[in-house]
Amino acid sequence: MPATTRLITIYGATGNQGGGVARSLLKNPCFQVRALTRNPNSPASQELAGLGAEIRRADGFDSNSLLAAFEGSWGVFVNINSDDKAFRPAGPTEYDLGMKIVDMAAQAGVQHFVFSSGPSSTELTNGKIRMKAMEMKNKIERYARNNTQFQTVSFICAAWYLENFLVKEIAPLFGGFPFVADAEAFLTFRCPRWGGKEDVPFISISDDYGDIVQGLFLDPHRWNGHVVHGCSDILTFDELVTHFQNVTGQKARFQPLESWETFDTFGVPELEDTKLMFGLTQTTGGLYFGPEPSEKNTAAALKRATAAALGLPRDQQTLITVKGWFQKHFPVTPN
């Protein structure tokens, strides 16, 4: 155990992103992890406790609760659930919560603030597309940048979750892939085209996301002000289904929808931003993370830094590929 450990507090610790960050940091004896949650008795909270995290109940809308939760923290990672039922159009909004988190973290003396952010869809599309979640997160990012009490602020924008392909309930939204074959016996992945060169960024939350964020905390001054493209691999939808077919032996194909506007959300409000995402990337020529093309070199460097800090061999210091991810999660189908 090192003589000095640094406390990282995670807001949203029981979610996908926050949980991934917690599990990565808990592997490094240089860090202590405080996991904030509304329900300390939940299975996700108890799992983190079993790994060595301090579990702390906290209410994001209560300033005193947040201030106490952030007390003594060297760093903070924040991911806000944009679909939180507590948000209302007239307030409180995600931005209201984000401002309070930033203010209380700064007041508590936090030195290094990392936020899961997103670009402004309205700015990228000249007002043609407005993704509510992205707009809120981008406003919070700007608010955090303007807070001069932090030593560093850095940001990460998560790509398309590969883990979504493990959720059978999601498959019908995308033609049934990778679980339900169509009438022609194909596992068909159906969605709008991405746009531009059709280079789609994907992230494995369980394999890479937490390590990328840990890399930011390992050298926070180097990454001060940066927005990291949180992705494991970048490839086309056609390449994705080809990898799946080659790995599993099952027939698979990509069938693009003619228009992003025809993507069926089945009346689920939370899926509206998914539909608008395709409108964003088609309007911007494939841009998703901001005004610059998607890249994974930065994520790869952060992954290497974390792997080296954990003493892992070189063959475990790389981001997982989509092909490797399918090999890990989908068995070969016998002939």
UniProtKB/Swiss-Prot annotation:
CDD domains in UniProt: NmrA_like_SDR_a (cd05251)
> What are the record's GO terms for cellular component?
nucleus
Q: Which domain of life is it from?
A: Eukaryota
Cross-referenced SUPFAM superfamilies, in alphabetical order?
A: NAD(P)-binding Rossmann-fold domains
Q: What does this protein do?
A: NmrA-like family domain-containing oxidoreductase; part of the gene cluster that mediates the biosynthesis of hancockiamides, an unusual new family of N-cinnamoylated piperazines. The NRPS hkm10 and the NmrA-like reductase hkm9 are proposed to convert two molecules of L-Phe to the intermediary piperazine called xenocockiamide A. Xenocockiamide A is then converted to hancockiamide D via a series of hydroxylations and O-methylations.
Q: What is this protein called?
A: NmrA-like family domain-containing oxidoreductase hkm9
PANTHER family listed in its UniProt record = NITROGEN METABOLITE REPRESSION PROTEIN NMRA FAMILY MEMBER (PTHR42748), NMRA LIKE REDOX SENSOR 1-RELATED (PTHR42748:SF7)
Q: Name one Pfam family in it.
A: NmrA
The record lists NADP(+) as bound by 12-17, 38-42, 59-60, 80-82, 137, 161-164
Q: How is it used?
A: Hancockiamide D displays potent cytotoxic activity against murine myeloma NS-1 cells, suggesting a potential antitumour application. More interestingly, hancockiamide C, the likely end metabolite of the hkm pathway, shows potent Arabidopsis thaliana seed anti-germination activity, but is inactive against the monocot Eragrostis tef seed, suggesting that it could be a herbicidal lead targeting monocots. The herbicidal activity of hancockiamide C could be due to its phenylpropanoid-like structural features, which may act on the plant lignan pathways, and hence warrants further investigations.
Name the UniProt key words of this record, in alphabetical order.
NADP, Oxidoreductase
Q: Which GO terms describe its molecular function?
A: oxidoreductase activity
> EC?
1.-.-.-
Q: Which family does it belong to?
A: Belongs to the NmrA-type oxidoreductase family.
Pathway in which the depicted protein is active: Secondary metabolite biosynthesis
Organism of this sequence: Aspergillus hancockii
